[in-house]
């Protein structure tokens, strides 16, 4: 099983727009609905089924692999992506947290199994390192896109 968790502070640059919890939440919702502007390795996304206001099934193409995910919103706190089909199965969490110092942060956690790779193997460790680096880049891209949208006033707070 490939597991990793990283936390990135949201408001580190005083010259950038300050993102509130509401703005970050709205950005995460937008990312869940259409990840293309936020995650460079995702080339396609289609909502397959809406199960409720806080839950839907989507199909994404991630580095050429087609993956089905059940996406669940926990308002103002977390988005859960449960990968149910594809080569890589498991759970990805995008959480909005407050650190001990009170600063807002995004915590990205994944717990995944990879088809065709033996548990605790060198290949699994290499996959984990590559995936972790990809997620750090995705977090940076997500925050950059949120700031751009905030500057353009295209990122309204969730209502």
Report the location of each language-model feature.
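Short solvent-exposed loop/turn micro-motifs enriched in small/polar/acidic residues
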Residues: 38-40, 64, 88-90
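Beta-strand elements of well-folded, non-transmembrane domains
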Residues: 10-12, 62-64, 112-116
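Hydrophobic ligand-binding cavity/cleft-lining segments
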Residues: 1-46
């Amino acid at each position: 099983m490939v597991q990793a968790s990283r936390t990135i502070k949201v408001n580190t640059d005083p010259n950038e727009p300050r993102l509130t919890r509401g703005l970050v939440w709205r950005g995460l919702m937008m990312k869940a609905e259409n990840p293309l502007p936020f995650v460079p390795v995702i080339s396609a996304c289609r909502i397959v089924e809406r199960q409720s206001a806080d839950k839907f099934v989507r199909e994404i193409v991630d580095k050429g692999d087609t993956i089905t995910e059940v996406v669940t919103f926990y308002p103002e706190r977390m988005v859960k992506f449960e990968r149910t089909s594809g080569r890589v199965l498991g759970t990805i969490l995008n959480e909005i947290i407050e650190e001990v110092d009170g600063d807002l942060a995004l915590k990205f956690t994944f717990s995944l199994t990879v088809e065709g790779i033996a548990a605790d193997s060198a290949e699994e460790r290499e996959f984990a390192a590559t995936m972790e680096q990809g997620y750090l880049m995705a977090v940076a891209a997500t925050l950059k896109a949120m700031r751009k949208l905030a500057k353009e006033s295209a990122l309204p707070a969730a209502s």
